């Protein structure tokens, strides 16, 4: 069974291995993106990025914890790069910002309180175990957030996708850490299937899910 599972993953990677790099233009705004996120990618639920909490609807987990959508590459970083003003100003005046914040490759389900805790803090490693919540391997210190190991590869590939797709900056120290996370936590079958679903919805793939070793070629 395990061998068949691995072969299936390989088949998915080979079948959809052609690179597609062009700004997504099929989802014009975040409201549409949210509808597609909950209604088309996760109509039957999944697990939250940071805590692995199972959910079957768009409002809460199975044990009643409120949900939200996490932008792995924070929207505040996008605004800083575009210099388009605050969130409302950027939504009103920058089409590029609207497309960036609506890119499904950068969006994951998260517990609302954990999403709020992370804010726009960069990811990193906190020296000692410092769980913010007793039900979740998520750590927070001033100016740094440490996700659970099983989420780190997804996070790395999302950030590098946003960097290449939109020219968004990534700090060199963070890039080095994310490259290691990509090595340690390769794409799962679910991440590969999600890549396929998103391509159907917005016309772009994350090439680093298809070819994670290409991340090593990125220069910072």
Stretches with model-predicted labels:
Residues 8-10, 20:
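Cleavable N-terminal signal peptides
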Residues 61-68, 72-220:
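Domain-level detector of nuclease and nuclease-like folds
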């Amino acid at each position: 069974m395990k061998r068949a599972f691995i072969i299936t993953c390989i088949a998915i990677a080979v079948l959809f291995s052609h690179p597609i790099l062009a700004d997504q233009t099929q989802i014009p705004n975040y409201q549409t993106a949210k509808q597609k996120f909950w209604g088309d990618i996760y109509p039957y639920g999944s697990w939250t990025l940071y805590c692995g909490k199972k959910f079957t609807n768009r409002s809460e987990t199975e044990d009643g914890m409120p949900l939200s959508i996490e932008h792995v590459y924070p929207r505040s970083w996008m605004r800083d790069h575009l210099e388009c003003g605050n969130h409302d100003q950027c939504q009103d005046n920058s089409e590029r910002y609207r497309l960036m914040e609506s890119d499904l490759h950068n969006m994951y389900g998260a517990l609302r309180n954990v999403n709020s805790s992370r804010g726009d803090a960069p990811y990193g490693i906190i020296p000692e175990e410092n769980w913010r919540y007793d039900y979740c391997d998520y750590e927070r210190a001033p100016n740094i957030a440490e996700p659970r190991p099983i989420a780190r590869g997804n996070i790395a590939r999302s950030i590098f996708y946003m960097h290449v797709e939109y020219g968004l900056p990534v700090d060199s120290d963070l890039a080095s850490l994310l490259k290691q996370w990509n090595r340690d936590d390769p794409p799962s079958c679910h991440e590969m299937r999600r890549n396929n679903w998103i391509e159907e919805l917005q016309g772009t793939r994350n090439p680093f899910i298809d070819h994670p070793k290409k991340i090593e070629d990125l220069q910072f």
